[in-house]
Amino acid sequence: MKNPVGIISMQFIRPFTSESLHFLKKSRALGFDFIELLVPEPEDGLDAAEVRRICEGEGLGLVLAARVNLQRSIASEEAAARAGGRDYLKYCIEAAEALGATIVGGPLYGEPLVFAGRPPFPWTAEQIATRAARTVEGLAEVAPLAASAGKVFGLEPLNRFETDIVNTTAQAIEVVDAVGSPGLGVMLDTFHMNMEERSIPDAIRATGARLVHFQANENHRGFPGTGTMDWTAIARALGQAGYAGPVSLEPFRRDDERVALPIAHWRAPHEDEDEKLRAGLGLIRSAITLAEVTH
């Protein structure tokens, strides 16, 4: 079974509002099987029913990406922020139901990046352990709710320059196993794995059945095939892990402060990128097919 391949909505625009609905049809026209949409904020004014109608009509699947922050962090020292984090993750379940999505992925626990306005702060080992325990506690509360609704959260490790607690695949596995709910799995992103893992294929195989979402990104966050990633080995590892779920492309390329600031990305091109997207999609699909026929 071939994995569905999708594109993140930030490739086109952010925020994604009711004025952005034409990008759903564009994603399908480019050949993608699904779109990875940021969980809409109430102020975005997105009509969930209309999004669902268009996606169903186009045969376009939907995956959601959570947006945590300082005010909604289940790892926070502040009780109000922890409550905000739990409430937000519960809202993500509701949004997934309204939009017709099953997977909600992301770091989930909040407070990533100094670039997003968080002042640098040297966590001690004890503080990080406490934050990790709070993360497990918070996810243990919301993951069963997701499972009951037929949804699943994907906990994404981010590299050491962007967050704490979960930087590696092994750390994500540890949290997921500690929670022990079918409503929580692991989400992997090759951009971050390229910095943190000694072997990306080995990390994928170690994740195994815990893997619920996968992002195929180059080492420089550009289009697949323009960097150093060994897509054949990565696709083969996905097959060996028994992963048949969605594979999303996430090239952060927009000249937009709402994208650039949180990820410290300053070099966005100004040309039409549709052909690069098609080529990247074709490369990932070919790698998956090759892995299947040579397995």
UniProtKB/Swiss-Prot annotation:
Active site, renumbered: 156 (proton donor/acceptor), 250 (proton donor/acceptor)
Cofactor: Mn(2+)
UniProt keyword terms in alphabetical order: Isomerase, Manganese, Metal-binding
Keyword field contains Ribonucleoprotein: no
Any one GO molecular function term: isomerase activity
InterPro entries, alphabetized: IolE/XylAMocC-like (IPR050312), Xyl_isomerase-like_sf (IPR036237), Xyl_isomerase-like_TIM-brl (IPR013022)
Residue pairs linked by disulfide bridges in the UniProt entry: none
Binding site for Mn(2+): 156, 189, 250
Listed name of the protein: D-tagatose 3-epimerase
Catalytic reaction list: keto-D-tagatose = keto-D-sorbose; D-allulose = keto-D-fructose; D-ribulose = D-xylulose
Subunit and partners: Homodimer.
Protein's job: Catalyzes the epimerization of various ketoses at the C(3) position. It is able to interconvert D-tagatose and D-fructose to D-sorbose and D-psicose, respectively. The enzyme is also able to accept other ketopentoses such as D-ribulose and D-xylulose with lower efficiency.
Spans traversing the lipid bilayer: none
Stored PANTHER family: HYDROXYPYRUVATE ISOMERASE (PTHR12110), INOSOSE DEHYDRATASE (PTHR12110:SF41)
Top-rank taxon: Bacteria
Protein family (similarity comment): Belongs to the hyi family.
Activity under varying temperature: Optimum temperature is around 40 degrees Celsius. The enzyme is stable below 40 degrees Celsius, but decreases with increasing temperature.
pH dependence statement: Optimum pH is 9. The enzyme is stable from 8 to 10.
Binding locations of substrate: 162, 189-192, 221
Keyword Hydrolase attributed: no
Enzyme Commission number: 5.1.3.31
